[in-house]
UniProtKB/Swiss-Prot annotation:
This is Small ribosomal subunit protein bS16. The gene is rpsP. Residues 84-120 are annotated as: Disordered. It comes from Beijerinckia indica subsp. indica (strain ATCC 9039 / DSM 1715 / NCIMB 8712). It comes from the Bacteria. GO terms for cellular component: cytoplasm; small ribosomal subunit. The keyword Ribosomal protein applies.
Length: 120
């Protein structure tokens, strides 16, 4: 049984409210859970003290028992300095793709050819 520390959505339509729960990975998102360890209200200001309410001791206990936090919960726990979340790095994300590079190379070659013809 693999355990996850994840968000279970509550609240009304367009007014989300999340419980931070420990649940079996196979259980439904908003369904059965083992223990509720906190709450998260995304509508509150980022610096509001009650935006994230979490029992840090329970979170540490569950992490020690092998529960895996989801990406969003890992971000929240990192913000509370409970765990250290590794930052993701994709240096190729902003680079042009293959066809765009080919077009740029063709345009550069055409510009160079035009410049050499104008100089001659």
């Amino acid at each position: 049984m693999s355990l996850k520390i994840r968000l279970a959505r509550g609240g009304a339509k367009k007014r989300p409210f999340y419980r931070i729960v420990v649940a079996d990975a196979r259980a439904p998102r908003d369904g059965r859970f083992i223990e509720r360890i906190g709450t998260f209200d995304p509508l509150k200001a980022k610096n509001a003290p009650d935006r994230i309410v979490l029992d840090a001791e329970k979170a540490k206990d569950w992490l020690a028992k092998g529960a895996q936090p989801t990406d969003r919960v890992a971000r929240l726990l990192d913000g509370l300095e409970i765990i250290k979340r590794e930052s993701r790095n994709n240096p190729q994300q902003g680079q042009p793709k293959k066809k765009a590079q080919e077009r740029a190379a063709a345009a550069a070659a055409a510009a160079e050819k035009a410049a050499s013809e104008a100089a001659a």
